[in-house]
């Protein structure tokens, strides 16, 4: 796994494609037209073009994506905010203040949980990327809602953060997470078996057995 190794921008695009698509082959997106000049033929082309098609990435602003460049924490956070549904133009992820606005929303979304000392411009390591991605898939997605003004006929859109139970883990992988409290531990010397009782607000009490 090489946890201390650096993550490239192409690798980040691949990981985001997986949390969005599951097992769907991103090669289907190789035909997507973009204004990026340095990705055709790259191993990550399909993943990059998928992310581009979803508004998750937009390149460097000079027509390039720099797929082999290391990704920084704030760049990864911007991609992940797009993955959970935020709109870059609405949230101010473009222009001179983009990094400030990305950092604000990433912190509010809990992307930096358990990542002490991570600074915006630090090159992201593989273990940091794994933690940030886990934090992103475990937070509520953002839903785009149309609002129609019957008087003017104008449609505007609002972006609303959903509860943490409505997240990418559930939407992509049909996985639900819950926090539990260990309330009781028992040991049977006859069976050489531990029984743990866990409790949470959703499922009540659950017992788990473990053989010593």
Pin down the residues of each PLM region.
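Short aromatic-glycine-enriched beta-strand elements
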Residues: 192-198
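Surface-exposed binding/hinge segments that line
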Residues: 127, 131-132
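Short nucleic-acid-contacting surface segments enriched for D/E, G, S/T with interspersed K/R
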Residues: 212
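Feature responds to low-complexity, polar/acidic, surface-exposed segments characteristic
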Residues: 1-13, 17-45, 54-74, 81-123, ...
